[in-house]
Amino acid sequence: IMIIGEAPGANEDKQGEPFVGRGGKLLDDMLKMIGLDRSRLYITNSVKCRPPENRDPMNTEKDACKGYLQRQRALMQPKIIVCLGRVSAMEIIRPDFKISQEHGQFFEKDGCLMMALYHPAALLRDPRKKPETFEDLKRLQGNGTLFAHKTARKGLVIPAGHVPAQVPV
């Protein structure tokens, strides 16, 4: 699993590692709740440099970092990519991605299964989104991921909440 965020925040910029601030702590806690350990995942950002004043990355910044992200993906060869936030999802899944409508859905692209979740910073700003994000995360574990791998087709969307309790192997 490869997790791709948007861009470094102040803490990440200081420490040179993604998701180390409050958002990183929340991400770690959420991953633990579904039995995933951060040390077994590859976590990066689509933009490698911190945009001033925490603004969304500009197209020129995204374009400047595209090659780095492509090389990371080529080296890691992830089976699953989780985009954290709108900016990452629009960069990785498709430019018109709507995080409020499409979070938690699996998409197949370039032989890789992809899903977008609300960014941890968005969850800190609006804690009411945490339960639905946790439900989205649960789809990454166990039968949900197995089901998605078996049924995803190029361009096919598997809606959130559409995972049977048991999937025969």
What positions do the PLM features span?
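A polyanion-binding, active-site-adjacent surface
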Residues: 1-169
